[in-house]
Amino acid sequence: MWWFQQGLSFLPSALVIWTSAAFIFSYITAVTLHHIDPALPYISDTGTVAPEKCLFGAMLNIAAVLCIATIYVRYKQVHALSPEENVIIKLNKAGLVLGILSCLGLSIVANFQKTTLFAAHVSGAVLTFGMGSLYMFVQTILSYQMQPKIHGKQVFWIRLLLVIWCGVSALSMLTCSSVLHSGNFGTDLEQKLHWNPEDKGYVLHMITTAAEWSMSFSFFGFFLTYIRDFQKISLRVEANLHGLTLYDTAPCPINNERTRLLSRDI
């Protein structure tokens, strides 16, 4: 059996691979059509102009669904491992909410381009990166709370390093972006897709975009740490029928059907 066939480990793998493919394909398309500069564009710039924005939006919507599935499995796993720990239960619920909000933001970013609805796009980015960063932080605390009984210290330290990486990237991005859009480097910068080294604010722009890509990579790394954990879990779905037919008849007791939510043989 291959490693991705064990439990639900294919979920975080598929999430990272699919999201990376969304970025790569839209980037290649945008650069080939000269819609953006090859050197470190904003991630969302790779999906601003047609036809790449169609590809970007469709693929990131699927990525958001994969992300919700991954976050839900993680929630169920932690709940099953620590059903009576009040602190862990509260943190686990908070992580679920934060994760879902981050996925919602990802879908908003994918479907509202910055050149058309800038406010909606920025709101989606704040949800994606802001709530996503908090989700990583909460999951790292959970990893600390669950060691050494549930898992070893190595997982906690890896996730902590990824959270620090994410935090440094976020701070760099927010600082440089705030200065860049302060009004001292021109107006309507959100509409600008091409930057030249002689442009005012070029260095700040490059630092901001580099930090954004770096932050995304920290997200990828964090979800990849779920692979080993997800090898040890599977979910089932139960169908409860209230009658032998679908007509409006009185309910009668029958055997319920139980099958795996996701098969090991996928």
UniProtKB/Swiss-Prot annotation:
Induction: Not induced by p53/TP53 or TP73/p73. It is found in: Lysosome membrane; Photoreceptor inner segment; Apical cell membrane. It comes from the Eukaryota. Keywords: Apoptosis, Autophagy, Cell membrane, Cone-rod dystrophy, Disease variant, Lysosome, Membrane, Transmembrane, Transmembrane helix. Signal peptide: none annotated. Plays a role in the initiation of autophagy. In the retina, might be involved in the process of photoreceptor cells renewal and recycling to preserve visual function. Induces apoptotic cell death when coexpressed with DRAM1. Belongs to the DRAM/TMEM150 family. This is DNA damage-regulated autophagy modulator protein 2.
